[in-house]
């Protein structure tokens, strides 16, 4: 399956194995005028499907930076089928932007023709696995490009789930040839909430399928009886234990494109660049370690 999409995978600009930044509306003008030293930017596909100033800004920014598209609306886990019109709109954005990478979420968000503004978890079953694989195949065929699936952050589990999430994701990649977007913060959040072993999760993912890593902040909410839950809210700096897990991910997967995400209480662009610099330093350390390991 990989070979089918190889010719279009990096149509405009290769996404480098460096730290990039999630591009948000409040930073458009600054990026155009100041041209910060960012390696690449990622945008949410759905934010650039209509008119207004956003697509025009992106057209200008893509002339100077590689762009990755990250979608939230394909609902690849929905049992009622893929929204063909939405898929076509994704394709239209791709034709205009020529992204280096295209990604979506392992989740669902459509039921009864109604779009639910959230990324909802799937039961990890053979039936759900078949549905997701079918949807991913449909998407890749329509888009004529390999897409990557992001592991979710979750706060509950289904009693009838029979497949560990990491095995589910790896199997989708195996069957469809899609990539895996390894969200390290999501792994840490879900592992903390469910009592999973985060390192074992990383080790279960096929390294050759990992095309990108995401890093973001999360919050901790107090529940009753002294319990806590971690919420993937993308509203703060990356937490120290997530940085530690990122170091382990680099050892497992090697240097890969790594994104700093920040979606709530979005700060000045300089703050995101500071976080990207920390990620870049970790990537460079791993790159140097690889050189030492491979030296004669």
For each of these PLM feature ranges, what is it?
Residues 1-92:
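N-terminal pre-domain/capping segments
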Residues 28-29, 44-54, 75-85, 155-163, ...:
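Acidic-and-aromatic substrate-binding clefts and catalytic sites of carbohydrate-active enzymes
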Residues 30-36, 52-69, 85-100, 140-142, ...:
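Acidic (Asp/Glu)-rich catalytic clusters
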Residues 41, 102, 183, 213, ...:
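Conserved, mostly hydrophobic/aromatic
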Residues 50, 81, 119-125, 129, ...:
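Gly/Pro-rich active-site loop or hairpin
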Residues 85-180:
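Active-site acidic/histidine proton-transfer and metal-coordination neighborhood
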Residues 257-263:
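Conserved active-site loop/cleft motifs that coordinate metal ions or position small ligands
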Residues 269-292:
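C-terminal helical cap(s) of enzyme catalytic domains, especially alpha/beta-barrels
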């Amino acid at each position: 399956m990989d070979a089918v999409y190889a010719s279009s995978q990096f149509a405009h600009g290769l996404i480098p194995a460096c730290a990039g930044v999630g591009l948000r509306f409040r930073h458009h003008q600054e990026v155009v005028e100041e041209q910060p030293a960012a390696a690449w930017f990622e945008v949410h596909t759905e934010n650039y499907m209509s008119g207004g100033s956003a697509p025009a800004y992106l057209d200008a920014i893509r002339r100077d930076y590689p762009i990755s598209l990250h979608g939230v609306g394909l609902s690849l886990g929905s049992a009622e089928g893929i929204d063909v019109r939405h898929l076509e709109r994704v394709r239209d954005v791709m034709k205009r932007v020529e992204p280096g990478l295209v990604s979506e979420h392992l989740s669902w968000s459509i039921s009864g023709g109604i779009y639910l503004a959230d990324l909802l978890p799937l039961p990890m079953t053979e039936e759900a696995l078949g549905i997701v694989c079918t949807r991913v195949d449909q998407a890749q065929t329509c888009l004529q490009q390999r897409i990557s699936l992001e592991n979710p952050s979750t706060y509950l589990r289904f009693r009838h789930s029979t497949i560990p999430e990491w095995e589910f994701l790896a199997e989708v990649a195996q069957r469809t040839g899609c990539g895996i977007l390894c969200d390290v913060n999501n792994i840490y959040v879900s592992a903390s909430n469910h009592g999973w072993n985060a390192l074992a999760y990383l080790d279960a993912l096929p390294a050759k399928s990992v095309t990108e890593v995401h890093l973001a902040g999360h919050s901790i909410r107090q529940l009753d009886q002294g319990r806590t839950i971690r919420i993937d809210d993308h509203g703060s700096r990356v937490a120290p234990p997530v940085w530690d897990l990122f170091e382990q991910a680099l050892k497992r997967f090697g240097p890969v494109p790594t994104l700093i995400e920040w979606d709530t209480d979005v700060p000045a662009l300089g703050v995101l660049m500071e976080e990207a610099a920390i990620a870049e330093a970790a990537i460079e350390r791993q790159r140097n370690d690889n050189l030492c390991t491979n030296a004669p």
